[in-house]
Curated annotation (Swiss-Prot):
NCBIfam families referenced in this protein's UniProt entry, alphabetically: rplP_bact
Organism superkingdom: Bacteria
Protein name: Large ribosomal subunit protein uL16
Organism: Herpetosiphon aurantiacus (strain ATCC 23779 / DSM 785 / 114-95)
Gene from which this protein is expressed: rplP
Organism lineage: Bacteria, Bacillati, Chloroflexota, Chloroflexia, Herpetosiphonales
Subunit structure: Part of the 50S ribosomal subunit.
Length: 145
């Protein structure tokens, strides 16, 4: 699982404000194909790992996969049937906060139809709606702007 090596504060506040669209990480930079989120939400480290395994399994370990998000926000939970008070709960998992337009995964070294199917299967593992994009389609879209 992905998680930060070291944090300044062990149990910070929950990520709340997920308004607006992604400014950073919104273009396909490394590969030729990408998976872009269409809505805001949290993606856990387990969901990222599940999607990564799905992609690598479908492309039969051919090509290269880039994970463009990192789960850096800890989410705490208290044990079940615990009374109120007695401090904040322990860290249960880490999430990446996603805004619409954020590139989640990139893929290179495989044909477009294989990449599209692999990223479609990966999108089914994620809690946000996603779409398939290519580097060429993004360049055309940015010039029209």
């Amino acid at each position: 699982m992905l998680m930060p090596k070291q944090m300044k504060y062990r149990r910070p506040h929950r990520p709340r404000n997920i308004k607006g669209i992604a400014q950073r990480g919104a273009t396909v930079a490394f590969g030729d194909f990408g998976l872009v989120s269409l809505e805001a939400g949290w993606i856990t480290s387990r969901q990222i790992e599940s999607a990564r395994r799905t992609i690598t399994n479908y492309v039969k370990r051919g090509g290269k996969v880039w994970i463009r998000i990192f789960p850096d926000r800890p989410i705490t939970q208290k044990p079940a049937e615990t009374r109120m008070g007695s401090g904040k709960g322990s860290v249960e998992y880490y999430v990446a906060v996603i805004k619409p337009g954020r590139v989640l995964f990139e893929l290179n070294g495989v044909p477009e139809d294989v990449a599209q199917e692999a990223l479609r299967r990966a999108a089914q593992k994620l809690p946000v709606k996603c779409k398939f994009v290519t580097k060429a389609s993004q360049e055309v879209g940015s010039n029209e702007g």
